[in-house]
Amino acid sequence: MPHFSLKKHTDHSIIFEGNYASLKDCLEHAVERNISLSHVNLKNHNLTNANIDNADMPYADLSGTNLTGANLSEADISNALFHNCGLYNTCLSESNLKNSDFRGASFGATLINGANLRGCVFSTLSACDLDFQHAADMFFCQYITTEGDHYNMSNPPIVIKGLLNVPIIIFDDIIKIGSKTLSKTNMPQISHILSFYTHKIIT
């Protein structure tokens, strides 16, 4: 079998190594043995359906990694990079994801119930569909637009689709309609517009 090693992305030192059928098998064995994988470099790997629950890998770099169907429940993945990561059908339940960066990450049927998301950063529309209502903590979360605007997201965003030709997203302090941003002080005016369109659809 080929030789695989798990290295830190900071100084490239080897954390764990051995002969395995795949890097995923190497990672799963390291997690099974309770090896600390702090700062592990897992960038641009295919970890589809990986079973790494209870993993100890704060500050991990998972940028560009395919984590579709992976089980990362009850893990410490705080301060990690999830840039452009695929997280479809991924289980992050009960995990510590505090201060992790999810810019560019794609979500779909992603489980985050009981997860600590305090201070996390998001940027994709699919992130707004996450079930934040059942997360343990999402205080100080931020949503960053493609234009570089930062929106506070300490509460679950409200997403309205199908009413206009662009989604309407209500964040803590602002309302985003497509590329336009409005203050929540405009809510009465927006409510009137939405009421008009709703009535138009019904009739």
Predicted segments, located by residue:
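A short beta-strand micro-motif
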Residues: 3-8
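GIY-YIG-like beta-to-alpha core
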Residues: 11
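Tandem repeat scaffolds
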Residues: 14, 18-203
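Short, surface-exposed loop and linker segments with low hydrophobicity and enrichment for Pro/Ser/Thr
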Residues: 1-2, 29
